[in-house]
Regions:
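A structural signal for short, hydrophobic/glycine-enriched beta-strand patches
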Residues: 28-163
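Hydrophobic membrane-insertion alpha-helices, especially the h-region
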Residues: 9-28
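General helical structural elements
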Residues: 11-12, 60, 172
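A transmembrane-helix-recognition feature enriched in membrane-embedded lipid enzymes
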Residues: 157-186
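Trafficking entry modules
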Residues: 41, 191-194
Length: 196
């Protein structure tokens, strides 16, 4: 009888531990769903352009015009990327979507209060879904909402990249690393293309 009781305690402890780890890892996904949508006050919206390109700047302009208050803007690009057509604050960090989003999360975490409450990701239509999901994972635990809420259906190539990148960002939340070092060939190629 004693052995059965101990076994039950171990199973309960494992179940509780697994639940706690699962909740911790999914918390960035859950927070944006249950937290209220912040109202737009001056300076609370930030439109982020991931790597410059005329289409991405045009998307940022459309987003900015659709908001009730003029948003702040930020460009995250590779040093070899296209410079913006107009002066825009820049982060020259990140060599792929995952590392650009983690650079954004780090930058936002160190901004003085009041920080941006909503972040709008401006990128190519095919890239929007993956970029927004990754930004929600990285910024959700900070209570920052990420949009746009509606995006075009991504190509099959983009959909294939979504799950591995989402797992990278979930691991980044847990460990502080996007595990890019585990793929040295891809890492070297991306860094060379980006100029870092």
């Amino acid at each position: 009888m004693l052995f059965g009781h101990k076994r039950r305690q171990v199973l309960v402890a494992l179940l509780l531990g697994t639940s706690a780890v699962g909740m911790w890892l999914t918390w960035p996904w859950i927070v944006p769903l249950v937290s209220p949508v912040p109202t737009s006050i001056a300076g609370s919206d930030l439109v982020v352009v991931l790597d410059g390109g005329s289409g991405r700047f045009a998307a940022a302009d459309r987003m900015g015009h659709a908001l009730p208050q003029r948003p702040q803007r930020l460009l995250i690009r590779c040093p070899r990327g296209t410079p913006p057509p107009q002066p825009t604050p820049e982060l020259l960090q990140g060599f792929d979507t995952a590392t650009q989003v983690t650079a954004l999360a780090h930058w936002l975490r160190h901004q003085p209060s009041p920080r941006s409450a909503r972040v709008w990701i401006a990128t190519d239509p095919d890239h929007t879904a993956r970029a927004v999901v990754l930004a929600r994972i990285a910024l959700g635990s900070q209570g920052i909402r990420v949009g746009p809420a509606d995006w075009p259906t991504p190509s099959s190539a983009e959909r294939r990249r979504l799950l591995p990148d989402a797992l990278r960002l979930t691991l980044w939340q847990a460990t502080g690393s996007t595990v890019a070092r585990l793929f040295p060939g891809a890492l070297a190629r991306k860094r060379a293309d980006c100029g870092v």
